[in-house]
């Protein structure tokens, strides 16, 4: 079974994007990372930093998660990210996404030993 940490990595880490500048990036990535199996995942963020840099956020600024839990952490520095958002015309199995690039602080929920990201909470 896929661990929560491995799932986070599959869903959110793309350290060396080949074609992030392309408007097709989200359509390709959401499919290749299995985020369109059974349904179209409505929103997803990919972080273009090393896994080590993203894991390090778990020892940075402690903040409350959207759901009120206290195990979320905000990155001290901005990170290069791409937001993928389902378009109005998207219909499973032909999931369609809008690709938006940004540089933002990321907020992740961390748990376990080692203490690693298991959920992507927000970007600010």
UniProtKB/Swiss-Prot annotation:
Residues annotated as binding substrate: 7, 10, 41-45, 66, 85
Swiss-Prot/TrEMBL catalytic activity? an [RNA] containing cytidine + H2O = an [RNA]-3'-cytidine-3'-phosphate + a 5'-hydroxy-ribonucleotide-3'-[RNA]; an [RNA] containing uridine + H2O = an [RNA]-3'-uridine-3'-phosphate + a 5'-hydroxy-ribonucleotide-3'-[RNA]
Q: Which InterPro entries match?
A: RNaseA, RNaseA-like_dom_sf, RNaseA_AS, RNaseA_domain
The primary site where this protein sits is secreted
Query: What does the entry give for GO biological process?
Result: defense response to Gram-positive bacterium
Its EC number(s): 4.6.1.18
Mind listing the GO molecular function terms for this protein?
lyase activity; nucleic acid binding; ribonuclease A activity
Q: Which residues are glycosylated?
A: 34
Per UniProt, subcellular location reads as: Secreted
This protein's GO cellular component annotations are:
extracellular region
User: Residue ranges under compositional bias (Basic and acidic residues)?
Assistant: 1-13
Disulfide bond sites: 26-84, 40-95, 58-110, 65-72
Top-level taxon of the source organism: Eukaryota
Where are the stretches annotated Disordered?
A: 1-24
Which Pfam families does the annotation name?
A: RnaseA (PF00074)
Family affiliation: Belongs to the pancreatic ribonuclease family.
The protein's assembly and partners: Monomer. Interacts with and forms tight 1:1 complexes with RNH1. Dimerization of two such complexes may occur. Interaction with RNH1 inhibits this protein.
Please describe what this protein does.
Answer: Endonuclease that catalyzes the cleavage of RNA on the 3' side of pyrimidine nucleotides. Acts on single-stranded and double-stranded RNA.
Name it.
Answer: Ribonuclease pancreatic
Q: Which gene encodes it?
A: RNASE1
